[in-house]
UniProtKB/Swiss-Prot annotation:
The lineage of its organism: Bacteria, Pseudomonadati, Campylobacterota, Epsilonproteobacteria, Campylobacterales. This is Peptide chain release factor 2. The modification N5-methylglutamine is found at Q251. Its main location: cytoplasm. The keyword Lipid metabolism does not apply.
Length: 369
């Protein structure tokens, strides 16, 4: 790195800090913290434990955000001042030290950007993920299985816990359907970026002629809703089907009709669970899945979310990411516009950078609007 590159980097980082400031509005955070302090000093504050807890969580979240912002802003300012001073005094040792620390400075900005992206009301919640293959039989079933493995490896890398709720094996290979819950800090905040259609292009291992095939799978991600969130579900709007579990493992498989499928007739949302031997427990889990899906459905309606998955055939029109393995190797996300050549690593779960690029891109677009 030379002096020109370093000064350009500082300018770029300073612009990012200004953009972040416009989004998080630090002055408003300080006003809100003062309001919370006044509320906490009221004698009746602890009369409502639930409300007090919610206020405490809000205070912690916005305090941490403000602290990170101030630290980053101060680090950029200090770097500017120290560089100008060292440059004026021809202090090469200090200048080289600043050059070496440039990546660390850039990482601080990126971490702040990601913290800003994951500050939504539901981002800290667990995530319920469902993968559905599109038309194409064995090809699409295998692609859905590859995506499932990719997410399992991602969760392993991030220290998230995964609990499979429903697993339907494909007739020849792969899977027909899978639903699982991901538990961990900001699980939904990260995985919500995976909501959409994923497209695979490759030479088929199931085609003796070795022809190129295109497959699609949809990924649906919902926040796990708290029990105290009121989602009204009327019994008359539900159709319940019971069937024998067909997933991998478990001595109860194919012996009793313990698996449960629930269809919410007004929205067409379908959830199913065969995780437990008990039909009652599977029904309770499926109802929780339905509640989470309906909660996400209402959020999408209210926010007119652009990334809402439409009730249509899985195909070309709604894809968020393409994974091309032949005739060249590239993964490209249509939202961030970023392309990646490390296809093997990505399919092995190395998707955090892709997700973070999408989150930053979406926030930047929303800020421009």
């Amino acid at each position: 790195m030379d002096s020109y590159e370093y000064t350009e980097l500082l300018k770029k980082l300073n612009t990012k800090v200004q953009n972040i400031s416009r989004v998080i509005k630090p002055q408003d955070i300080e006003i809100r913290l003062k309001e919370i302090e006044d509320i906490e000093n009221r004698p009746e504050f602890w009369n409502d434990i639930k409300k007090a807890s919610e206020i405490g969580k809000e205070k912690t979240k916005i305090s941490n955000m403000l602290c990170k912002f101030k630290n980053v802003k101060s680090a950029i300012s200090d770097a500017y001042e120290l560089y100008e001073l060292a440059n004026a005094e021809d202090d090469e040792q200090t200048i080289n030290s600043l050059f070496e620390d440039a990546q660390n400075l850039e990482n601080k900005i990126t971490n702040l950007e990601i913290s800003m992206m994951l500050s939504g009301e539901d981002d800290s919640k667990n995530a319920i993920v469902s993968i559905h293959p599109g038309a194409g039989g064995t090809e699409s079933n295998d692609w859905a299985s590859m995506l499932y493995r990719m997410y399992l490896r991602f969760c392993e890398r991030e220290g998230f816990k995964v609990e499979t709720l429903d697993f339907q094996e494909g007739d020849e290979a792969g899977l027909k359907d899978v639903s699982f819950i991901v538990k961990g800090e900001n699980a939904y905040g990260y995985l919500k970026a995976e909501n959409g259609i994923h497209r695979l292009v490759r030479t088929s291992p199931f085609d003796s002629a070795g022809r190129r095939h295109t497959s699609f799978s949809s990924v649906m991600v919902s926040p796990e809703v708290d029990d105290d969130i009121a989602i009204e579900i009327e019994e008359k709007d539900l159709r319940l089907d019971y069937y024998r579990a067909s997933g991998a493992g478990g001595q109860h498989v194919n012996k009793t009709e313990s698996a449960v499928r629930i269809t919410h007739i007004p929205t067409g949302i379908v959830v199913q669970c065969q995780n437990d031997r008990s039909q009652h427990k599977n029904k309770a889990t499926a109802m929780k899945m339905l509640k989470s899906r309906l909660y996400e459905f209402e959020l999408m309606k209210q926010q007119e979310a652009n990334n809402a998955i439409e009730k249509s055939e899985i195909g070309w029109g709604h894809q968020i990411r393409s994974y091309v393995l032949f005739p060249y190797q590239q993964v490209k996300d249509t939202r961030s516009g970023e392309a990646y050549s490390q296809t093997d690593a990505i399919l092995d779960g190395d998707i955090k950078k892709i997700i973070e690029s999408v989150l930053i891109s979406q926030k930047s677009s929303a800020n421009k609007e």
